[in-house]
Amino acid sequence: ERFAPRYIELVIVADHSVATKYNDNVTAILSWVHQLVNNIILFYRDLNVHFTLSAVEVWSNGDLINVQPEATVTLNLFGEWRERDLLNRRMHDNAQLLNNVALDDNTIGLAYDEGMCDPKYSVGIVKDHSAINRMVAATMAHEIGHNLGMNHDGSQCNCGGNGCVMSAVLMQQHSYQFSDCSKDEYQRYLTNHNPQCILNQP
């Protein structure tokens, strides 16, 4: 194995816009979120990164932060909320906000680079932008990739197919593989930062 195993305990928050999109059908939302995680698990197999879904929170009664089109602002507020609120009641390593708000500049996701395990910065936001689960999962896997030190792929990066996970553009014909560049960047991140929270097996 090129990579030692790592274990990410994930919390996914579905905001009020997602609750509304699914007509407040929490069962449907949970099913969708479980499918997302199952897809993310597949994408990360090559990196020996294992995911468990620690919790799903659905903001049925209204958002607990001010979710807004400016993605950087929403991401910052979500990180602050995680540190202040979520971490105090739920052990986890990383939190992702699933939303259905029209984000500025056609953004479908945003995350902090190298944020994994940091109380505020181990977060991402992902738009529920497709009826194809794998497409949304690819975006969430991409944002978690940023948290794990991966940058966008340049033209020289290769994953043996179209559209690697860290490609700047999401394509229908995605290969859902991490490129050689991503693997090198992930390895460098582990070496330089060795984020402690993902060492323990849940």
Curated annotation (Swiss-Prot):
Modifications after synthesis and translation: Glycosylated.
Positions that bind Ca(2+): E9, D93, C197, N200
GO biological process: proteolysis; regulation of blood coagulation
Pfam family, one: Reprolysin
GO cellular component: extracellular region; plasma membrane
Span of domain Peptidase M12B: 6-202
Glycosylation, residue list: N25
UniProt-listed InterPro entries: MetalloPept_cat_dom_sf, Peptidase_M12B, Reprolysin_adamalysin
Note: Negative results: has no hemorrhagic activity. Has no activity toward factor X (F10), prothrombin (F2) and protein C (PROC).
PANTHER family: ADAM A DISINTEGRIN AND METALLOPROTEASE DOMAIN (PTHR11905), DISINTEGRIN AND METALLOPROTEINASE DOMAIN-CONTAINING PROTEIN 28 (PTHR11905:SF32)
Summary of the function given for this chain in its UniProt record: Has fibrino(geno)lytic activity on the alpha and beta chains of fibrinogen (FGA and FGB). Inhibits human ADP- and collagen-induced platelet aggregation on platelet-rich plasma but does not affect the thrombin-induced aggregation of rabbit washed platelets. Slightly degrades plasminogen.
Protein known as: Snake venom metalloproteinase fibrolase
